[in-house]
Amino acid sequence: MPSRKTGKSIITKIQKKPGKIQVYFGKEKIELSLNAFTEFRLFEGKEVTQAEKSKMLSYSEMDADYAYALGLLGRKAYTEMELRQKLIANGASEESRRKIVKLLKQHGYLDDEEYAQTYAEEAMEIKCYGRKRILYELQNKGIDEKILQKLRFPQEKEKEASERAFKTYLVRFHSFPKRKKQEKMRRALYERGFDEELINYWIQRIPDGDPALEEDRLRKEYEKTKLSYSRKYEGRALKERLIASLMKKGYPYDEIKEIMEEERYEND
């Protein structure tokens, strides 16, 4: 309650709660962090100005925000931009965010340069990302261009990553015709962030499929597609849609035509 003589509020009661301290000024109550309470050396009967109250609350707010930030960083690494976004979402003020980021950087808990290097190494080793994808992801995480320019991507390491990705996709795309397999492989490796030279290197190493197996797949796909389109089309329209659909799936035009010729011969 404010003193009539000084205009200051007098602390009438102090109550400790789990993780916080409640300080009473008559009917008025404020809640402070343990650190804020200790920092301002509060006790019953002490007179406090309104400006001092504001400082206590700001200190306490920053204390809570700092603990929140440490909790986040204890679970995983963040870039400075990502951490700022988390603090904003948690309601931290601009001043609190600025001070917290400064403190975390001073204590080595927040280091964009170290983050970028670690991310680049792990993304290439574990996720099989190429240089372009890694730089793209780091830019989205707010890493400064000067830091990105310092990163080094050993060619041998990137080639090894591309090989692991290539082998994974070979298994995934095994049921497709070779041409479709090449299209999918090119797109997949491009999305992983590998450059054109590496992509072409692996495209050339896609093995030819078993001819008998490839033909069997085409014939089955031909019958399936024909059955679907024949419900709506016939004659030339059916033929055109059959060819377009099968070529889109990666089957060669001349092999499709050969099956059509066989079918026409059998029907004559």
Model-derived features: where do they sit?
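An alpha-helical, amphipathic repeat domain used for nucleic-acid recognition
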Residues: 1-268
